[in-house]
Amino acid sequence: MSAVLDHDDHDHDDHHDHAPTGWRRWVYATNHKDIGTLYLLFSFTMLMVGGVLALLIRAELFQPGLQLVNPELFNQLTTMHGLIMVFGAIMPGFVGFANWMVPLQIGAADMAFARMNNFSFWLLIPAGLMIVGSFFMPGGAPAAGWTLYAPLTLQMGPSMDAGIFALHILGASSIMGSINIIVTILNMRAPGMTLMKMPMFCWTWLITAYLLIAVMPVLAGAITMTLTDRHFGTSFFNPGGGGDPVMYQHIFWFFGHPEVYIMILPAFGIISQVVPAFSRKRLFGYASMVYATSSIAILSFVVWAHHMFTVGMPVTGQLFFMYSTMLIAVPTAVKIFNWIATMWRGSMTFETPMLFAVGFIFVFTMGGFTGLILAMAPIDIQLQDTYYVVAHFHYVLVAGSLYGMFAGFYYWSPKWTGVMYNEARGKIHFWWSLIAFNVTFFPMHFLGLAGMPRRYADYPMQFADFNAIASVGAFAFGLAQVYFFFWIALPVMMGKGEKASQKPWEGAEGLEWEIPSPAPFHTFETPPKLNPAANRVID
């Protein structure tokens, strides 16, 4: 191996070459690996908090009638579950993956702006505390739904202001993280790594970062207008003063639809790394994958009103948004076709990362089909705000984003920790999660088709059976994640397990497998020399 990679063999006089110790290592962290770890820990913590809220929702809906919570608290639970999962669990989780893997995959020494990286993480802590703490404010947490539609938000208690402030902080954190990722990818690639030789995970994050910078200010604008309507006498969304609540929906969903692609594109990137590794083949159609990802990002800006077919829109508008939404299925199908083509006639083995990747493709595609169904305006007018919609977006967000993160964890954790996770337990986690997930959300399609509306604490008797099944599935799914934490994640974090080799996966390619396991504190301090495919370091 070249001198670039001999990290520990020679003496370093410089103080910064040794990892700082104790609490300072984490509080003052500027190393991309430490910050990535912090993001992932924060993300998992919020996943557990959001999960507890979800289980309270499902416990309430286990039977008709009011069991545990009153309707006001129920609406707080649904609102906060959505906000915490989207802004506290999924987004920081993928930023953690980006921090850890992007510099390793492009042969960079670190992220471009190390201190800004630290700042963008530590902003999450007060924001998270404020969101969770809003439950303890007068009047309870925000209860307007995670979309925070006016006019309800104009009548909420003081916790609404805390929620708005927290979202502003999270938005600032996301924008800083995105600037960091863009500058790192565009400026810090090792010589010889052109953009079209970059790993797919870096591509998806580059595109995601541009999306974040484009739409986070739009959310900030919407919630700032809500704030001024609440306290400063404006009437942006207040019909009494000549405002329009529907305008809020337009502004929010212009942010909200690109946002759901922000949450899925990094998962696409992880799947595009895992599938070739366990098929022992190059990714099929690399260029088309890049163009498909870009197409998804561009199209995501012209589909927002499909969330609003029922608010009163000219038929021309409905047709435009219906067709543009159906069009986005084309690049998505290109990606799914390419993953299947990558597996075609490959020497496949099914270790846990591959199981999650195949599970992702299968269940995410089901979510995509229900999305295609909801894209059709006449059908959506029937199904809007029913449990069919809940089923659809949990199929793409849980079986999409969350499974993508699990695949990434199992794939890269040997590089992070230096030890292998327990393969048998990983497989248990996969099957348990997959079955429990489908038991939870599949019946919701039937509930929605039968007309059960979302966001109600009580429901008529005819919906009882499927709700009971869904609640049992939800508790099983939650238990599977507790199992994952205590029996899979904790042991590897504590360094228990078989020692991981430099490249534990036979078919894996890329610069992250050219450094020792666990990854040294400093990597690629001098830019590595790469082979023509830019996936190996040469002497």
Predicted features, each with a name:
Residues 2-539:
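Membrane-embedded and interfacial regions of multi-pass energy-transducing membrane proteins
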